[in-house]
């Protein structure tokens, strides 16, 4: 079975150095000295390796000569660069090579021999056809951690079904929980790409930790579909035990009422969450100033409020139209109830908490310094790094020299259009 390939491979001497050795151009970080070979494109793979790169790993991003990662062509809004590429590829080294040619394949195998981790998010079977599958590479390098991210996983009846975030959201039930009663909606960010990328990062870190004990790598198989299933939360339990399909309730909560954004009299939305009996009491007395709701049998308990959601929601909506948003914010703040605003992106980027926590950073790029969103990871002894966004293939020659290629050999690879 492939999941045992790395663990069962015979340990052999490595010809190109030790895993975890110090390498050039690394900032201090929790993963300093870890080399990740990234055969990645689009979102799920690059987001995983950005997490690793932010924490100090040396990520070598393999790209197609001339065009690079397909996400480079999505738009050109960042002074000519793609917003998606800028988002996902800071702190990485760009290595441009044609893996389909024999000489390019040999370079890739030598790189894998000297890597701690290989991440690929090709369709299942593509890496094997290229000669870069787990069986072969783990036999050469038994310490290699080989992580595959795909739509549905490396086996099963949907293995070869093409996958995009929207399609997986639908197949995995995310869309069944999202939207309004008369129409479904997808989550606005690519949630299944992000979920699978985070599970991949966790899996890689776990495998690195286990390798410290065993000396051996292993194969990791992550799917967007299963990552989305794992994030369905309590909905499967309601179906298993009550036969209950989730309602689509828009920006409301399925089981807590009132909960969500309500338009105030000046057209600004105010979000609130009334989740406990205490909060319901405080909300009725001090915020809504409708003590009679506490005596209404339709609203006494959380199940009662859920059962009579329509009546209660309509009452709260009408109430909020009576005052401007700042009055509701004041009442909620004074009552110490959970609340917030619905901010646009411009407001988010100027949010005082984001500014205070330095979540907006600048990073070098081929077009000069550009703003990026920082990392939510905050480790007291392992700072996140903010180095640079690479131009296509900028690190190809240095990486080849590190592998022992001479200037003449590099020129030959370039003449043959391998790099």
Feature-to-residue mapping (PLM):
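N-terminal helix-loop segment corresponding to the beta1-alpha1 unit
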Residues: 2-213, 391, 397-419
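A glycine-rich dinucleotide-binding beta-alpha-beta segment and adjacent secondary-structure elements
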Residues: 334-386
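Oxidoreductase and adenylate-handling cofactor-binding alpha/beta cores
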Residues: 197-217, 230-242, 284-290
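Glycine-rich beta-alpha junction loops
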Residues: 66, 152-153, 224-229, 266-268, ...
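Flexible glycine/proline-enriched surface loops and loop-helix/loop-strand junctions
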Residues: 183-192, 263-268, 382
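Aromatic-enriched alpha-helical interface/lid elements that frame and gate functional surfaces
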Residues: 258-335, 339
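Short Gly/Pro-enriched turn/cap motifs at secondary-structure boundaries
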Residues: 85, 249-254, 260-261, 272, ...
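Conserved Rossmann-fold dehydrogenase catalytic segment
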Residues: 154, 181-191, 212-228, 244-254, ...
């Amino acid at each position: 079975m492939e999941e045992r390939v790395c663990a069962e491979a015979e340990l052999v001497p490595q010809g190109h150095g030790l895993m975890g050795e110090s390498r050039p151009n690394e900032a201090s970080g929790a993963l300093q000295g870890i080399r990740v070979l990234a055969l990645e494109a689009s979102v799920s793979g690059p987001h995983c390796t950005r997490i690793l790169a932010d924490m100090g790993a040396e990520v070598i991003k393999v790209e197609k000569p001339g065009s690079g990662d397909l996400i480079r062509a999505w738009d050109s809004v960042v002074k000519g660069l793609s917003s998606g590429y800028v988002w996902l590829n800071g702190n990485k080294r760009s290595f441009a090579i044609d893996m389909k040619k024999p000489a390019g394949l040999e370079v890739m195998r030598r790189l894998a021999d000297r890597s701690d981790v290989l991440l690929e998010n090709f369709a299942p079977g593509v890496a094997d056809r290229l000669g870069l599958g787990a069986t072969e590479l783990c036999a050469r390098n038994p310490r290699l951690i080989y992580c595959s991210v795909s739509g549905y996983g490396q086996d099963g009846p949907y293995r070869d079904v093409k996958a995009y975030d929207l399609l997986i959201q639908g197949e995995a039930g995310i869309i069944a929980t999202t939207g309004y009663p008369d129409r479904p909606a997808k989550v606005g960010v690519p949630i299944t790409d992000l979920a699978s990328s985070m599970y991949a990062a966790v899996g890689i870190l776990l495998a690195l930790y286990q390798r410290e004990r065993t000396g051996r790598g292993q194969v990791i198989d992550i799917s967007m579909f299963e990552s989305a299933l794992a994030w369905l939360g309590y909905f499967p339990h309601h179906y298993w035990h009550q036969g209950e399909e989730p309602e689509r309730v828009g920006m409301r909560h399925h089981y807590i009422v009132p909960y969500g954004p309500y338009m105030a009299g000046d057209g600004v939305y105010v979000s609130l969450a009334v989740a406990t009996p205490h909060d319901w009491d405080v909300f009725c007395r001090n915020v809504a100033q409708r003590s009679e709701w506490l005596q209404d049998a339709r609203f006494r308990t959380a199940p009662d409020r859920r059962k009579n959601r329509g009546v209660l929601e309509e009452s709260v909506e009408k109430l909020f139209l009576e005052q401007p948003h700042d009055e509701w914010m004041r009442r909620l703040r004074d009552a110490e109830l959970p609340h917030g605003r619905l901010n646009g992106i411009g407001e988010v980027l100027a949010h005082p908490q984001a500014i205070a926590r330095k979540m907006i950073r600048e990073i070098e790029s081929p077009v000069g310094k550009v703003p990026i969103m920082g990392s939510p990871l905050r480790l007291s002894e392992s700072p996140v790094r903010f180095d640079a966004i690479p131009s296509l293939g900028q690190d190809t020659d240095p990486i080849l020299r590190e592998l022992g290629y001479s200037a003449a050999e590099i020129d030959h690879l370039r003449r043959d259009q391998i790099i």
